Swiss-Prot record:
Induction: Repressed under nutrient-rich culture conditions. It comes from Aspergillus fumigatus (strain ATCC MYA-4609 / CBS 101355 / FGSC A1100 / Af293) (Neosartorya fumigata). Keywords: Aspartyl protease, Cell membrane, Glycoprotein, GPI-anchor, Hydrolase, Lipoprotein, Membrane, Protease, Signal, Virulence. Residues 1-19 form the signal peptide. Residues 453-474 form a propeptide. Secreted aspartic-type endopeptidase which is secreted and contributes to virulence. The lineage of its organism: Eukaryota, Fungi, Dikarya, Ascomycota, Pezizomycotina. It comes from the Eukaryota. Its EC number is 3.4.23.-. Gene3D superfamilies: Acid Proteases. This is Aspartic-type endopeptidase ctsD. It is a lipid-anchor; GPI-anchor. The gene is ctsD. The keyword Membrane applies. Belongs to the peptidase A1 family.
């Protein structure tokens, strides 16, 4: 975004594609659009298009609702969310990566402001911008989350600038402010957004905001990003982040993000790096190829955006079709947009970078049951054009990934085999103390995040797909 636009009354939060929405909507999304360098961050939820029998009103010709009952999860009751808390790490500068129990989203506890208010933020390499729900927000989505404002921090300085982020059915918008953020032993003073309005997209989702860890040094506020501030203050010996994502079915609560150094206990073999390519907005690297059961797909001139804020893998429809054609029993629906496959698939799916291949486990690419088959979590969506993939947590759960800000590269190694942790159901106290960490007060695998409002319990349909970005800059 140009400097002049940053001085306008509304600032768009992000400029890279990412995916992150708890609901699915009946939206028309183009899968064949050309790539654009001038897009603002937008989370666009969409519905699965299973076959041509579905009409534009969200139902089939037989009157069956398009909304898929993939899995019902009681995410909120009396302003509480059930989540799986990761074990508190013992290594320095490391944050526990919690999740909601479906491998759908991962988030860390960040302390905000002079009183160190605990908030759950997605650590998102898809963009450099950071925002939290503000205390001035009165929408239901905000009331169901922890909020932050002047009453919670004597050091908060509000700025006369606004921002807005577009969603499929609404907006999240607010003001900018400057205050301290503390994560993994790193204390950073920076500018971030405080949401004053939020659409229904976040009503049933656990997170209180997003911490942008994109490759760009500056956010779209034209202010330094979190990692740029860390680098300027020389808080780490190396400006790198290593991610290890938990898989809930493994029974281990070992998700973590470590800053400044490699955690050699979390991977086997060597880290092999690939230099980034393209503009500085994305963590994008050249993709060698993909294969199924050893048969190469023979993709050429492809690149992949590696995004911790995206749940699934999104490939251009033609590429997704080629890959699924090699999986025994896979069936293409929706013109290469969505796929079904055998629920007991054992096909070995691999992607290759810098001459090495990495598995995507059937535990990750086989999604929820649909009829006699299961849905594939590898989706046909051309978010950046016909030659760019978006690889999210479906892939990242299989590797230890390193984002190297100093040398502009991404490294992978195979994850260590996780060891299952004992599980205990516990509840978090309302308004958790600023002096008690999540690991010290919430020691079990199931915990409850508590806010200030009382909301009636309800079940929600969790979506099958994370979402995308498409709002064009004015």
């Amino acid at each position: 975004m140009h400097l002049l636009q940053c001085l306008l009354s509304t600032i768009s939060l992000a400029s890279t594609v990412t995916a992150f929405v708890p609901y699915s909507f009946n939206l028309e999304v183009s899968t064949e659009g050309p790539p654009s360098n001038d897009v603002a961050r937008r989370f666009v939820p969409w519905k699965l298009l299973l076959d041509d029998s579905y009409n534009n009103h969200g139902s089939s010709s037989n009157g069956v609702s398009l909304t898929l009952d993939l899995k019902k999860f009681p995410v909120r009751r009396d302003n509480k969310y059930k989540v799986v808390l990761a074990d508190e790490p013992t290594t320095p500068n490391t944050a526990a990566l919690n999740q909601e129990g479906l491998d759908y989203s991962y988030f860390a506890t960040v302390r905000v402001g002079s009183q160190g208010q605990q908030m759950w933020l997605v650590l998102d390499t898809g963009g450099p911008n950071t925002w939290v729900f503000g205390s001035d927000c009165t929408t239901v989505a905000c009331q169901r989350h922890e909020t932050f404002g002047e009453a919670a921090s004597k050091s908060l300085k509000l700025l006369p600038l606004n921002w807005a982020v577009g969603y499929g059915t609404g907006l999240v918008s607010g003001v900018l402010g400057t205050d301290s953020l503390s994560l993994a032993g790193l204390d950073v003073n920076m500018t971030f957004g405080l949401a004053k309005n939020a659409s229904t997209d976040f009503e049933s989702y656990p997170v209180d905001g997003i911490l942008g860890l994109g490759r760009s040094a500056n956010s779209n506020f034209n202010t330094p990003s979190f990692m740029e501030t860390v680098a300027t203050q020389r808080l780490l010996k190396s400006n790198i982040i290593g991610f290890s994502f938990s898989r809930n079915s493994d029974g281990a609560r070992d998700g973590a993000a470590n800053f400044g150094d490699l955690d050699t206990t979390r991977f086997t073999g060597d880290i092999v790096y690939t230099n980034t390519t393209g503009d500085s907005n994305n963590w994008r690297i050249p993709l060698d190829d993909a294969s199924v059961n050893g048969t190469p797909c023979r993709f050429v001139n492809k690149t992949a955006v590696i995004d911790t804020g995206t749940s699934y893998a999104m490939l251009p429809p033609k590429d997704a079709t080629v890959l699924h054609n090699l999986i025994p029993g896979a069936v293409t629906t929706s013109h290469g947009q969505n796929f079904t496959l055998p629920c007991n698939s054992t096909a070995v799916v691999q992607v290759s970078f810098s001459g090495l291949s990495y598995n995507i486990s059937p535990k990750d690419y086989v999604g929820p049951a649909y009829g006699s088959a299961c849905l594939s979590t590898i989706v046909g969506q051309a978010l950046y054009g016909d030659d760019v993939w978006l690889l999210g947590d479906v892939f990242l759960k299989n590797v230890y990934s390193v984002f190297d800000y100093d040398n502009h590269r991404i490294g992978f190694a195979n994850r260590s085999v996780p060891i299952a942790s004992p599980t205990t159901t516990v509840a978090a106290a309302a308004n958790p103390s600023a002096t008690d960490g999540a690991g010290s007060t919430l020691t079990g695998s199931m915990a409850v995040h508590t806010g200030s409002a009382s909301i009636v319990s309800r079940f929600v349909h969790w979506p099958f797909i994370f979402a995308l970005l498409c709002m064009v800059l004015v």
